[in-house]
């Protein structure tokens, strides 16, 4: 147990630094960058479902009502990392980028039997990371280049409680503390030495709280189980500080800005069907209503982000002596719209993955492979391959052995 606690503490400390190398996408220049959907590894392989999922093998922070599905004597923690390879193509050519990142660290344990459970963790909310240069001219006499760069992102720490209010209904809530900063720079350079180079750097820093509520209805008859779930977050203005620094060859100017920013209202629903802990089929819908939020006082346009996901998981026999029969096999698809109007590209992905249970211990190593495409006619196109691996570790910390 002591080794597990030490490992968990070290993982949480390491997990406090997210998003520094999570993306290289030029589209992360807009809005708050690339958004993270905060799903456990097993559900990512099922296309990204989660709202209607309820399992004692996974910690599911996307649905706070699901925590009471944990075993009454089991402490769980989960840590995940990812590798992302992306090909970008536009009118200026094609390029490839590779990124790696710690995805999340979460834990979960029961407080009172199967009626009350607690979960906590740290994970990224968004990531910004891009560098590119565009060249052009003003007539035949003046040639210039505009260099863009950005980095940073927002991280969130959460704590959540789940309650079984009866044998077929669970309620839950997560409280999130969000923090982080985004820095974006633009540099205008002329080939003519008589013209000044101008640089502008903008930095946004946030510290804020928000809440997510979850509800699940579940019913088992014979070897069949069905779960219906829903989530909701209210729109929330967050605390922030921001400044703009403008540098030229002759002078520097620093301005403290006063703009309003908000997190969106979020709502969604999901359903899952399970047969004998062998076959699970699930689908979700979620909306982040960015269109009704303030972003730079409304000076830049955001729009609602809609996300549809569906997936399936199969295990031939979870208690078989044959290892291949105890493995989990997963497939999924997802489709989501962009939340920024500046670069309005849908994201389409297909996923597959495997769960490898370790012998005689309550640990499952999950792997996810995702291929996705973002883009449209005449826009920046991205084709990406993402690999995610996570260790979902369960230990009987509350079991008293008889002497």
Model-derived regions, located:
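Subset of outer-membrane beta-barrel
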Residues: 20-403
